[in-house]
């Protein structure tokens, strides 16, 4: 016998929804805004005994847009459930690693797969219009297109699986998507970076070249699973620093594979993960993976006890700024470069509610010229941190033909990051002269020091008050 609860959930005699999960547990997650199908799917995979793990899985579903209710109500050629049933025999020889690798590449692609889907649907609409103009009824056209699309998608999906299996092998002889012949940068099997919270620092020898040392510190982020040669090129432009590849699942509910190039110290990092469910849920919405970035930036807390001047490029909705705020690092001045007015509005609202420093907004990174950079440096006494991650639209996504590497329209903006960083370093070295050299020597000592934390201090020039705050570290 089934009884309808007050929340509209059918219960059996044992008080379980649909005979598989306690109705109270289902109602709890439905009240949080998750769809019924998503909740049942998560409980089916995890069981009904650990609500914490169920929530983690639901957050992951929501972050990657994997809502089973979408697939069940559509006959689209993109329906993964139909394809998985049809390809069951073909997948007999798959192992779990292949599945996980393909799942990561296909779904954790930072939203660029949405653009592929929209373009595919637009092309499908054009095909239907063409068939209607030839005299076919629209219903028949749709059925024909859906059937043909499903068959074609099955073939493409099968080809993609074979390609992914091949891609999991050494890639030294593959032709890069962007036409370059850069040697690939192999990704580590376990993306744990230089260290993990509550885990001792492994033996990492990181000798940064002199030109990579500050001022300022810099921090660059992008997707780890980029086309062949991309990270080699990025590393070459950023002073041949080897990236720190990190899988964010070690830090928060979202699962993202990222690469970071920076000249920060790697000793004495502190973990700052929000332990509450609400904190982890909010972290999913930030442009950077806040927990991961905060862990890396935590070394700056003792170096800049009086606050920082930050140049934030491609800021999104402020993941970097949120990370610094959570670390308790005062942001005296932030020059923000973000082209999206929606993102800018969200970040400005957050800033007004939480910060007391100065926020300067620039819409387009191309408008940040060397002349404007020099004006800012003279006005605020220099930048302590240049941080950002250029768009990954041409580096990730399910449609490999859109992956143009660093030659793509959006990903090519990386070169503006390098241009601006190089201008900041050159101008600051020219303005501050010997003081900049002193900073560089102390920075090098900090990076080489193997003992306890070192608080960085530099001498002050009483005759020059314009750069007093930013150089008093």
Swiss-Prot record:
Q: Which GO terms describe its molecular function?
A: DNA (cytosine-5-)-methyltransferase activity; DNA binding
Kindly list the places in or outside the cell where this protein is found, as annotated in its UniProt entry. Answer: Nucleus
Provide the catalytic activity annotation: a 2'-deoxycytidine in DNA + S-adenosyl-L-methionine = a 5-methyl-2'-deoxycytidine in DNA + S-adenosyl-L-homocysteine + H(+)
Q: Name one Pfam family in it.
A: DNA_methylase
Q: Which gene encodes it?
A: DRM1A
Annotated keywords: DNA-binding, Methyltransferase, Nucleus, Repeat, S-adenosyl-L-methionine, Transferase
What GO cellular component term, any one, is given? nucleus
A GO biological-process term? methylation
InterPro entries listed in its UniProt record: C5_MeTfrase, SAM-dependent_MTases_sf, SAM_MeTfrase_DRM
Question: Region (Disordered) spans which residues?
Answer: 84-115
Comp. bias (Acidic residues): 84-101
Q: What is this protein called?
A: DNA (cytosine-5)-methyltransferase DRM1A
Give all residue intervals belonging to the SAM-dependent MTase DRM-type domain.
204-431
EC number(s) per UniProt? 2.1.1.37
Family of the protein in this entry: Belongs to the class I-like SAM-binding methyltransferase superfamily. DRM-methyltransferase family.
Domain UBA per the UniProt entry, residue ranges: 20-61, 120-140
């Amino acid at each position: 016998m089934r009884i309808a609860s007050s929340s509209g959930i059918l219960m059996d005699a044992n008080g379980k929804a649909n005979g598989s999960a306690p109705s109270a547990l289902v109602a709890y997650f439905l009240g949080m805004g998750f769809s019924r199908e998503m909740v049942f799917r998560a409980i089916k995979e995890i069981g009904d005994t650990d609500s914490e793990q169920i929530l983690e899985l639901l957050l992951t579903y929501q972050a990657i847009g994997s809502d089973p209710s979408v697939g069940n109500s559509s006959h689209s050629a993109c329906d993964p459930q139909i394809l998985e049933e049809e390809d069951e025999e073909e997948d007999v020889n798959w192992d779990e690693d292949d599945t996980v690798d393909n799942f990561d590449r296909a779904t954790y692609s930072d939203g660029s797969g949405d653009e592929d889907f929209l373009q595919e649907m637009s092309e499908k609409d054009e095909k239907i219009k063409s068939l209607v103009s030839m005299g076919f009824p629209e219903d028949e056209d749709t059925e024909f297109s859906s059937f043909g699309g499903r068959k074609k998608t099955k073939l493409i999906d099968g080809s993609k699986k074979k390609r992914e299996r091949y891609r999991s092998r050494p890639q030294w002889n593959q032709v890069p998507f962007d036409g370059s012949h850069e040697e690939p940068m192999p990704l580590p099997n376990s993306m744990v970076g230089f260290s993990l919270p509550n885990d001792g620092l492994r033996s990492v020898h990181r000798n940064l070249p002199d030109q990579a040392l500050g001022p300022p510190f810099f921090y660059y982020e992008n997707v780890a699973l980029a086309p062949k040669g991309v990270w080699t090129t990025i590393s070459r432009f950023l002073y041949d620093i080897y990236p720190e590849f990190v899988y964010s699942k070690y830090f928060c509910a979202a699962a993202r594979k990222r690469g970071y190039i920076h000249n920060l110290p790697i000793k004495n990092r502190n973990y700052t993960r929000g332990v509450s469910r609400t904190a982890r849920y909010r972290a999913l919405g930030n442009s950077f993976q806040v927990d991961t970035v905060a862990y890396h930036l935590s070394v700056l807390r003792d170096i800049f006890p009086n606050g920082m001047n930050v140049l934030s490029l491609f800021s999104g909705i402020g993941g970097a700024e949120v990370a610094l705020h959570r670390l308790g690092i005062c942001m005296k001045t932030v020059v923000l470069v973000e082209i999206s007015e929606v993102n800018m509005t969200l970040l400005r609202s957050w800033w007004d509610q939480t910060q007391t420093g100065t926020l300067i907004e620039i819409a387009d990174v191309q408008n940040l010229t060397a002349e404007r950079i020099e004006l800012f440096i003279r006005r605020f006494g220099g930048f302590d941190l240049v941080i950002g991650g250029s768009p990954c639209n041409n580096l990730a996504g399910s449609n490999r033909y859109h992956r143009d590497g660093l030659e793509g329209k959006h990903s090519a903006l990386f070169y503006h990051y390098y241009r601006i960083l190089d201008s900041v370093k050159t101008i600051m070295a020219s303005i501050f002269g010997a003081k900049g050299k002193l900073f560089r020597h102390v920075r090098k000592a900090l990076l080489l020091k193997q003992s306890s934390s070192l608080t960085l201090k530099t001498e002050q020039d009483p005759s020059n008050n314009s750069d007093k705050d930013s150089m008093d570290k």
